[in-house]
């Protein structure tokens, strides 16, 4: 492998899988190459909370031995290593949700998606950093470390899943899993130049995903190409009887749609431009790249029309009532008695269970988690439930109906993913409302339960990535994969290669020499 490490890790996940099938490379060699990059990059990127190198090598060796005789029959992405957001439980590998309250917890079981990855022969490189309990938009709220954006290590990678996005962008992993509650896959995707997908709610099992807001959470792929995301989503998707919100049907034909889209023929497709998402609050560079991408869709034959989603302006307010309310309920289980952190009062003897719970939660939760628990508890309290939580759910229903009406007019909706490019560390930490505004364009899809995807749209005037978002009808995830793959191909053609050709990667220099 020697000095080929940098070349190998820059291959897409699909290309790495093809090399495994041909016998050009083994799964062990892929894992070793990425572990080298992780060792070199982590001092400056800090994407991983836990690197499970020994586990990944053991899984790779088992795969190589099993697949030695019949490589042609291998499933898609077989042998390709993957990184996992530390919000998804992994048997035998510490899982913390980036919180002190779960420090040292090693789950006795795997999430459904992890079982599927293992069945597909994908070794697990490690667990990636996030905002504590996936609550944040910058990955600055992790209890352990701050992840840096590979495009500018003085800037945030987005959140909550900045670890997975940065790991993929920095070539520490070819592909990763994240969770998306209000944009936690897509917004980091926009800020790091990666592809981030939130599947239809219920399209991927949530069994084994640590609950933040159960009616909004969704596991999805993080990758460098649209095809890689399609391949991964088909692997992890499908019905799971252990998840009561799981959709009964199997995965949609997303891989076929992505491959069809790469032909760059969008004749007959009607694309809706969400008129409420743009203008004030969106950086000029973001809007410029977005408009250029829309022009590319038109050049490929798509009909682009302006569409109104009338109640989308209320999304942020409704979300920040519904989500904290569910957080308040879900995080009540961390009480210091069943598992995780336990903190005693100074006397060493708690007067009551509530007394011990108070000390544990005070020490174990960070400021942003406490803020959301307080907000949610207030919204659910007697006398305020109908005025706050009940009203927010009514707004959510209106937004769901808005999307249904919009999709009667068009096949797919488009909007910028994030109103800005990556901001500097600390810039918004003291202003929660400014931080929350980062998700203004991603939250609506979570409230409506519809699938959405962010792909790179180029670099803004500040040299930082901009994201372009596709939103498709519920349970029609494949509809967004075709135009996304087409736009990806058209843009890369105009850039003379993928966006990461412009990324400076000093951690790759000299690898293997």
From Swiss-Prot:
PROSITE patterns: AMIDASES (PS00571). Keywords: ATP-binding, Ligase, Nucleotide-binding, Protein biosynthesis. One of its GO terms (cellular component) is glutamyl-tRNA(Gln) amidotransferase complex. The active site is at residues 85, 160, 184. GO terms for biological process: translation. One of its GO terms (molecular function) is glutaminyl-tRNA synthase (glutamine-hydrolyzing) activity. It holds the Pfam family Amidase. Its EC number is 6.3.5.7. It is an enzyme of class 6 (ligase). Transmembrane segments: none annotated. It catalyses: L-glutamyl-tRNA(Gln) + L-glutamine + ATP + H2O = L-glutaminyl-tRNA(Gln) + L-glutamate + ADP + phosphate + H(+). Heterotrimer of A, B and C subunits. NCBIfam families: gatA. Belongs to the amidase family. GatA subfamily. Allows the formation of correctly charged Gln-tRNA(Gln) through the transamidation of misacylated Glu-tRNA(Gln) in organisms which lack glutaminyl-tRNA synthetase. The reaction takes place in the presence of glutamine and ATP through an activated gamma-phospho-Glu-tRNA(Gln). HAMAP family: GatA. This is Glutamyl-tRNA(Gln) amidotransferase subunit A. It comes from Bifidobacterium longum (strain NCC 2705).
